Amino acid sequence: IRRQRQMCIRDRLYVEHINYVSQAPSVQYRGIFINDEGWGITPWAGRTFDKELGDIGPKTYAKVCELILRMKGNMLAPAMHPSSGAFNKYPENKLVADSYGIIMSTSHCEPLLFNNVTEWDKKIMGEWNYMTNKEGINKMLDQRVLENAPYENIYTIAMRGIHDAGLVGVPKDKEVNLVQEVIADQRGILKKHIDSPIDSIPQIFVPYKEVLDIYERGLRLPEDIMLVWPDDNFGYIKRLNNKEERSRRGGAGVYYHISYLGEPHDYLWLNTTPPALMFEEMRKAYDTGAKRYWLLNVGDIKPGELGMKTFLDMAWDIDKFDFDNINNHQVDFLVSIFGERYREDIEDVMNSYYHLGFQHKPCLLYTSPSPRD
């Protein structure tokens, strides 16, 4: 029962002045990627905050931006599946992000903030094929940068197929040269619309899936572009900086999953990535120079709340964590909610949960049609 409290009116308010200087965060850009949103946040948003849109819209993104700030993050890669409207479909979305001081990024397959899943109309725009429709593709990318340049963004330099597919219509022996051309063209678009030196405009290159092979076959990446290493979709980072890459001016980062939709199998309903595994991988990445950009694929947000908190707390202060205390992090948070008297019970539940989930992810146990069907 909520107690009614009598309002007391005062004519003066005194606030104690305390000098406080915040520490510098361990990682410069720290944020989340909303992904595979069709089963959770999209229908929820359409029935609650953004009823008039029936979609994820500015009212929902305001709550997401507030959440990111409360967790000491500063960056968002928005939802981009066909089940939701593209972030830039609703002009108010970027105004909301800007009002919260949130830096907008995008996934590995969205060049220059363009979501080709729902914003590319094949009937009007033609094939998403850079070999045959370069002019049409760059026309859309040019328009997107023109519209979004006034805001703070991190631009993905990329060319893949539609959504999470590989390059279309490109012979393997021409892939490196084509991506090299793409990089030059997209940087040209940035130079055209942003009144800053190109090496001061935040850009990322994510060698995800087949792109890692293209990168390792001799792709020449400009020194100022951040090199963002992906994991294998199951929590193990596939590649770390070598000696030469550690000295790159653009620095490096990590794209990490605690939720995944794709081959060989999805895991969406439960976050079973152990904190110790996440710490081991992110600490290795940090120690080898991946400390400029950390992006967490958090799926629908709700199932991954604890993992998201651990990830962003590490991004804020990685040195607070070690192998002796990492398993206490989520326990301490839950104890702060439910009370110290439940600490042993919470420890037992969390240890058993991650032990069982690490042995075999529950989402991988079924052989019936996947959630996508």
Describe the function of each predicted region.
Residues 1-5, 9, 366-373:
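Single conserved hydrophobic/aromatic residue that forms the stacking wall/gate
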Residues 2-6, 10-131, 149, 205-207, ...:
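Feature activates predominantly on carbohydrate-active enzymes
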Residues 11-15, 88, 98, 128-249:
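Gly/Pro-rich turn-and-neighbor structural signature
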Residues 43-45, 167-170, 217, 238-240, ...:
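Short conserved micro-motifs at the rims of enzyme active sites and ligand-binding pockets
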Residues 54, 83, 127-131, 172-176, ...:
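Hydrophobic alpha-helical scaffolding
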Residues 64-67, 71, 93-96, 100-103, ...:
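Generic, well-ordered alpha-helical scaffold segments in large soluble proteins
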Residues 276-346:
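Substrate-binding cleft of secreted/luminal carbohydrate-active enzymes
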Residues 329-368, 372:
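Catalytic domains of carbohydrate-active enzymes that cleave complex glycans
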